Amino acid sequence: MTRPHLKKFRRIVVKVGSSLLIDSAAGKVRGEWLSALAADIAGLHGDGCDVLVVSSGAVALGRSKLKLPRGPLKLEESQAAAAVGQIALARIWSKVLADHGIGAGQILVTWQDTEERRRYLNARSTIAKLLEWRAVPVINENDTVATNEIRYGDNDRLAARVATMASADLLILLSDIDGLYDAPPHLNPDAKLITVVKRVTADIEAMAGSAASELSRGGMRTKIEAAKIATTAGTHMLIASGTIEHPLRAIMDGGPCTWFLTPANPVTARKRWIAGSLEPRGTLAIDAGAVAALRAGKSLLPAGVTRIDGHFARGDAVIVRGPNGHEIGRGLVAYDAADADRIKGRSSSDAAQLLGVRGRVEMIHRDDLVVGGPLGDSA
């Protein structure tokens, strides 16, 4: 199967591991390498691609700055090292991207931020706004309060969750290895690189090794887990070596890597999840004008909503019904039941004033809406 080209993707998440970012022997950031990576990111950004960075390294950078001895750290030591490292890490990314005229915005997340719906929606909205402003979100694990990320190396899976949250169509995991091999390459000189994986099977999972460096605890196994998360959500993923300068350019030039492909795309995968995997918590009744708007691919605005039923929180799944009670579709509602009831039937400007917010108010954004319920047409 032919491997895709990076320039076909419009939203890319690049994950950078600690062992790439930090020169452990010298105890400092690999400045020239990071500048080269920033140049690669700037090239994609200049072509109109949205780029997000998920950067490990807070703990590693903190322990370097604090001159902590080699070897395992206790949990509280790792968290304290992260507190020092996060400040330095944000400053470094801001500088290398500013050298190319690109703004950066730091977002600190934990695994729980991608799982708990309200926090998920807040983080997703922040990412969307930064991308709208053409800034590069630099997303770091909040190691000062997280525990599993530090102990178990969940950063690859966190990157996959971020890619899902951002509706990215590609996740790139830069590593200290070219990709997935059919045997451990450091033990078997005849090991072959798997260039394309169309589906993560038990055989593929069995190929994943568990070795990891001192600074980066995520081995190949967590990368395979990340691939399962990403491809299920409609995001392609690739693993490539980041040890060389200009690693993204090397991928574009046909350098070695492993692609994990998916037949879906983020929007269709997300809508399939909304339609079939979530238990609805309430119902929104809408008028005929809103039905026509939804069928034309528009978002659901408060003005078209006539009744609110149920007790739901922001981000919960709800059923949308037309004037005759038939199901029009399902979606993730942007407001809890109380606020939704306050703004139903109102213009967007009136709704914004009632809620004390600025900008356009949407009851359900079109990306969070699946039109065409199991009960058929309704208006």
Swiss-Prot record:
A molecular function GO annotation: glutamate 5-kinase activity
CDD domains xrefs: AAK_G5K_ProB, PUA_G5K
Record keywords, A-Z: Amino-acid biosynthesis, ATP-binding, Cytoplasm, Kinase, Nucleotide-binding, Proline biosynthesis, Transferase
Keyword Lipid metabolism part of the UniProt annotation: no
Compartments where located: Cytoplasm
Chain positions recorded as substrate binding sites: 56, 143, 155
Keyword Lipid biosynthesis set for record: no
EC number: 2.7.2.11
Gene Ontology biological process terms in this record: L-proline biosynthetic process
Catalytic reaction list: L-glutamate + ATP = L-glutamyl 5-phosphate + ADP
Origin: domain of life: Bacteria
Function description: Catalyzes the transfer of a phosphate group to glutamate to form L-glutamate 5-phosphate.
Protein name as catalogued: Glutamate 5-kinase
